[in-house]
Amino acid sequence: MPEPIDAMSFEDALSELERIVRGLEGGQMKLEDAISAYERGAALRRHCDAKLGEAEMRVRAIVQNDDGTTGTEPLADTGESGR
């Protein structure tokens, strides 16, 4: 059984997505297998997009202080708890 997508790192999800794309491009999959692979690939893409969005928010929160040192700035509260 494949690893749950929510538990995957960005790198692992991207690697699996690349394998799926290569398999689909090869044209050797049976139709049902191709559809299942496409569905998982779409979910992996959404997961990767979310991970990139989170990383972008973290990078944007890094600021340079007046004294030239680098610090972080708290992100605006999104109303979501547990993150």
From Swiss-Prot:
Gene3D superfamilies in UniProt: Exonuclease VII, small subunit (1.10.287.1040)
Catalytic activity: Exonucleolytic cleavage in either 5'- to 3'- or 3'- to 5'-direction to yield nucleoside 5'-phosphates
Record InterPro entries: Exonuc_VII_S (IPR003761), Exonuc_VII_ssu_sf (IPR037004)
Enzyme class per UniProt: hydrolase
One annotated GO biological process: DNA catabolic process
Enzyme Commission designation: 3.1.11.6
A GO MF label: exodeoxyribonuclease VII activity
Region: Disordered, residue numbers: 63-83
Location in the cell: Cytoplasm
Entry's Gene Ontology cellular component terms: cytosol; exodeoxyribonuclease VII complex
One Pfam short name: Exonuc_VII_S
Superkingdom in the source lineage: Bacteria
PANTHER family associated with the record: EXODEOXYRIBONUCLEASE 7 SMALL SUBUNIT
Family listed: Belongs to the XseB family.
HAMAP family the record matches: Exonuc_7_S (MF_00337)
Cited function: Bidirectionally degrades single-stranded DNA into large acid-insoluble oligonucleotides, which are then degraded further into small acid-soluble oligonucleotides.
Name of the molecule in the record: Exodeoxyribonuclease 7 small subunit
Lineage, opening ranks: Bacteria, Pseudomonadati, Pseudomonadota, Alphaproteobacteria, Acetobacterales
